[in-house]
UniProtKB/Swiss-Prot annotation:
Its main location: membrane. It is a multi-pass membrane protein. PROSITE patterns: MFS (PS50850). Belongs to the major facilitator superfamily. Sodium/anion cotransporter family. Disulfide bonds: none annotated. Keywords: Cell membrane, Glycoprotein, Ion transport, Membrane, Sodium, Sodium transport, Symport, Transmembrane, Transmembrane helix, Transport. Coiled coil: none annotated. It comes from Mus musculus (Mouse). It is found in: Apical cell membrane. This is Sodium-dependent phosphate transport protein 3. The lineage of its organism: Eukaryota, Metazoa, Chordata, Craniata, Vertebrata. PANTHER family: SODIUM-DEPENDENT PHOSPHATE TRANSPORT PROTEIN 3, SOLUTE CARRIER FAMILY 17. Acts as a membrane potential-dependent organic anion transporter, the transport requires a low concentration of chloride ions. Mediates chloride-dependent transport of urate. Can actively transport inorganic phosphate into cells via Na(+) cotransport. It comes from the Eukaryota.
Amino acid sequence: MDEKPTTRKGSGFCSLRYALALIMHFSNFTMITQRVSLSIAIIAMVNSTQHQDPANASTEGPVMDLLSNQSRGIKDFSTRAAVYQWSTETQGIIFSSISYGIILTLIPSGYLAGIFGAKQILGAGLLISSLLTLFTPLAADFGVILVIVIRTVQGMAQGMAWTGQFTIWAKWAPPLERSKLTSIAGSGAAFGSFIILCVGGLISQALGWPFIFYIFGSIGCVCCVLWFTVIYDDPMHHPCISVREKEHITSSVAQQSSSPRRSVPIKAMVRCLPLWAIFMGFFSHFWLCTIIITYLPTYISTVLHVNIRDSGVLSSLPFIAASSCTILGGQMADFLLSRNLLSLITVRKLFSSLGLLLPSLCAVALPFVTSSYIATIVLLILIPGTSNLCDSGFIINTLDVAPRYASFLMGISRGFGLTAGIISSTTTGFLISQDSESGWRNVFFLSAAVNMFGLIFYLIFGQAEIQSWAKERTLTRL
């Protein structure tokens, strides 16, 4: 794909498109904190004794010693919140319900965002998710069934909010700035994971577990106000954009029409190997990422024998690394493109290779360094950090090959990713239940193998040119 080096015109971090990227960063931050809130709160929701156990309180680790006196003094507040008798099986159903909800709306919401406008679809999803977060403590009082229903609907709302972002970027992001803008927006999820893991437990101890939902649900409502105020579907209709920036964006994306359409070329998509390369990349990427997100606290606790409070802080460190690598990767990718140092497909394959190969090497090395506390933590930080370099690779490749259908295809891509996450979580649970030491080794070896499969497939079939079926056709009637 040939692109004119016009990035300097109308560019700059003070431009409106970067403000949109920050709002999307905030919205992704909000959604991930709302999604993970229950994972933090449920420890207090179902356990009436652990947070009061003197033995647990007296076991200090290397990270949280300075907070020990404060945490002991404020524990009594958490006893005011209700405690529920939910079995581990019931908790598993509650956790998985939001993922099933996301899968239900990923594809249709991406399609509808392309037709009716991403601003309304995404904004509605964010608002619904925030309101349901606020009502989660009340729902818990009415019974576990209502909690499962709310989490499922919340997942459907978040599915609406995740995929439609690419419809906006197809119209707002100049080709030579796509990696940078999407990485700024996408890093909000990693930063949100870092924050919720850091402060979630402290909020529960200080104020009670319901305030985890109240605080992050309220933050989501504030984000909705910013969303509906600042976000517009395209630069042509934004009242605050400068003429210079508008001309820069419209001229940059002129060759990649993303106009609304009423039909989707499903057959052509199914036969398109470059799309399957993207799907396999998502499958591989989400396989290992889901294991890290879901089982990282468990791994740190069981392998390193770290107490719960230290485990929460240590579990948050990889996500600040992931957020940083996402932004740095986007900056580096666009630098290589703007200087014409590498072609677009070379950049996509380079960052995909780094994002799949490096975490695989770290995962394979993990079972051999368990005797070293520092080495284990460093590798655990590097896995999600290097993995997020994929955000400048196949993650945004749909904007290159089919910008008109970017949200629809992003929905399918995330569907592959969530499917991989469900399979990997189930497989991990089975493997570590048989034998902890060999089980973890097999988990990491299998994850590396899946990553290598996705990488090889993408390197062979990945492309960065607009596909023929994704181009807007002009019909001439005789």
